[in-house]
């Protein structure tokens, strides 16, 4: 990016920062005045139903095993087959199918393991009806989706402040999240785009909410209480999304995702329902995906 574009970018960052800052302040003050942030007492699922560290570690191990072992192994097998049979590299669409197989197997494996380990615990992690006036699963999902209007401006404001700091300290630097690059790669192939949308809009929110809120946050809550558990699980969630390819953008990404994850953790505790945090996560990813597909270049 040349020097002529620098003032324009600086102005855009300032304008966005002010806009999201005002929205975040006004909307969250209104929500606070209406009692939205009052949590009240919530049951310790991990303590009552025996959620242990070994189960949390196993669930994360299942996820990482598929991501770090299964995907590279299957990719190498397919590449070797094409090299031997056709003397060429496999079409890129094969790797989209690998992605679909992987995320599907991950969700199925997590469910089967958790259900076999303790079906009652799984039931209460997904939806705890022991809280006062529990709503329906659909109601929880919609509640979480609607809370996007509170969480998104805060995350966007923090991201813009971080971008401004990066601009002032290190100069102009553009970056893209790994998931954004993945989505843009699929735009020109309907099949690949459908697989990407399934991964980003359904598989990722369901899997990540189960792992970070349902498992990790529930276990941490037993050890340190609700608020520290939300903060710690949110920090783990943010760090989980870092990548060397994002450069200094990792700073902005980590801070904005941390604030967003705190909303996810709070919504999970407030509604005692994973459907609520999934609703918020799905909405966040859906709006972000819509913006990338229709309002960005490249």
Segments predicted by a language model, with ranges:
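N-terminal, membrane-interfacial amphipathic/helix-forming hydrophobic leader that caps
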Residues: 1-145, 286-298
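Transmembrane helix-loop-helix hairpins at the membrane interface
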Residues: 2-28, 153-161, 173-298
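Generic intrinsically disordered, low-complexity segments enriched for polar/acidic and small residues
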Residues: 60-63, 92, 108-110, 121, ...
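C-terminal TM-helix exit segments that contain a strictly Trp-centered aromatic cap at the helix terminus
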Residues: 66-76, 154-166
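Hydrophobic alpha-helical transmembrane segments of integral membrane proteins
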Residues: 68-69, 149-150, 201-202
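Membrane interface segments of multi-pass transport proteins and intramembrane proteases
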Residues: 79-88, 127-131, 166-175, 220-227
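Short alpha-helical transmembrane interface motifs in multi-pass membrane proteins
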Residues: 90-94, 143, 147, 164, ...
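Interfacial segments of alpha-helical transmembrane regions
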Residues: 138-154, 217
């Amino acid at each position: 990016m040349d020097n002529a574009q620098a003032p324009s970018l600086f102005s855009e960052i300032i304008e966005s920062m002010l806009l999201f800052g005002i929205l975040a302040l006004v909307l969250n003050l209104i929500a606070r005045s209406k009692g939205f942030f009052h949590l009240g007492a919530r049951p310790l699922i991990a303590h009552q139903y025996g959620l242990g560290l070994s189960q949390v570690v196993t669930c994360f191990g299942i996820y990482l095993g598929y991501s770090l072992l299964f995907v590279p192994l299957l990719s190498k097998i397919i590449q070797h087959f094409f090299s031997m049979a056709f003397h060429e590299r496999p079409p890129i669409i094969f790797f989209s199918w690998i992605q679909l197989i992987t995320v599907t197997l991950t969700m199925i494996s997590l469910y089967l393991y958790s259900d076999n380990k303790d079906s009652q615990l799984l039931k209460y992690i997904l939806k705890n009806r022991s809280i006062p006036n529990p709503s329906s699963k659909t109601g929880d999902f919609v509640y979480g989706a609607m809370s996007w209007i509170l969480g998104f401006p805060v995350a966007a404001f923090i991201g813009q402040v971080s971008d401004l700091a990066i601009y002032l300290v290190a100069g102009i630097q553009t970056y893209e999240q790994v998931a954004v690059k993945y989505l843009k790669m699929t735009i020109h192939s309907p099949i690949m785009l459908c697989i990407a949308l399934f991964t980003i809009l359904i598989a990722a929110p369901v899997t990540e909410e189960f792992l970070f809120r349902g498992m990790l946050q529930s276990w941490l809550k037993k050890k340190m209480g609700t608020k520290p558990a939300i903060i710690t699980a949110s920090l783990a969630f943010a760090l989980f999304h870092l990548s060397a390819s994002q450069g200094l953008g990792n700073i902005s990404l980590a801070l904005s995702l941390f604030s967003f994850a705190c909303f996810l953790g709070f919504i999970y505790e407030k509604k005692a329902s994973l459907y609520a945090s999934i609703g918020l996560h799905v909405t966040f990813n859906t709006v972000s995906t819509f913006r990338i597909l229709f309002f960005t270049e490249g």
